[in-house]
Amino acid sequence: PVSYYMDLNYTLIIDPKLDFDGSVYYIAYYKELEGLEGVGSTKELALKDLKQVKKDWFRLSLKIGAVIPEPQTKEELNEHSD
């Protein structure tokens, strides 16, 4: 079920970006879920957007039988950082 995946602790990254007019906005994404992004004028709004995108993507992935990656463990993250 979607709730199982929503409760997993994916590696969250939130990066500030500069818009063409010089204003700051934020892009939020999970390291393990390539292609999913949330965007907002604040970190909180970017995260809120990302959570909705993630939920929709999980629903669709489960419906079509796609593989959903699970979060990396701390050990796996350390192995890939060398």
Functional labels for PLM-detected ranges:
Residues 1-13, 44, 48-82:
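Short, charged, surface-exposed hinge/linker loops at domain edges
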Residues 14-34:
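Short aromatic-glycine-(Arg/Gly/Cys) micro-motifs in beta-strand/loop hairpins
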Residues 34-45:
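A short, exposed loop/beta-hairpin motif centered on an aromatic-Gly-Thr core
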